[in-house]
From Swiss-Prot:
Pfam family for this entry, one: Ham1p_like
Cellular compartments per GO CC: cytoplasm
Protein name, as recorded: Inosine triphosphate pyrophosphatase
Cited InterPro entries: ITPase, ITPase-like_fam, RdgB/HAM1
Binding site for Mg(2+): 44
Organism: Bos taurus (Bovine)
Residue numbers bearing the N-acetylalanine modification: 2
Amino acid sequence: MAASLAGKKIVFVTGNAKKLEEVIQILGDKFPCTLVAQKIDLPEYQGEPDEISIRKCQEAARQVQGPVLVEDTCLCFNALGGLPGPYIKWFLEKLKPEGLHQLLEGFQDKSAYALCTFAFSTGDPNEPVRLFRGRTMGRIVVPRGCRDFGWDPCFQPDGYEQTYAEMPKAEKNTISHRFRALLALQEYFSSLTPGVGDDHPSWGSGEG
């Protein structure tokens, strides 16, 4: 049961140190478990975002034989019917941020949304995988800002003049799709362990 995980380690499936750093910063010191990063080779599933997240989490839990947290991020262009969506990783590798912007060159609609899904498994195959989602609306722009974090340079959230890459990390971490998904995750764990997360400095900033 998830309620019995307080104080224990959860394997966060990532080989990206910056991603782990950002997740820990957002969750804060009130999160009842310790996240440890571990790179795991998972199959590249295809399908809808929820389906992909569940299958990846189930496979990660099978390999780890314990509690795991798996993150999937989609960048969805409305003009392209939601693409690249869960396949943004390969689009970014081939096209870079400039190419992502150029994909929409022939479209008036530059709107997009960033979707983050965290899938959590206790490690027990008989328990369902739980999904926690966060979405931030924005638009695709000419890349600006630091190039050390994926497609951040070409995504400008609604209501802001800066791209994700131009924002101070602390500011980005109060509006991002990742923040919103982690807020849902934190609230779930807080409901299992009363008093946890009550004093998080960013609470209330993530609901749009």
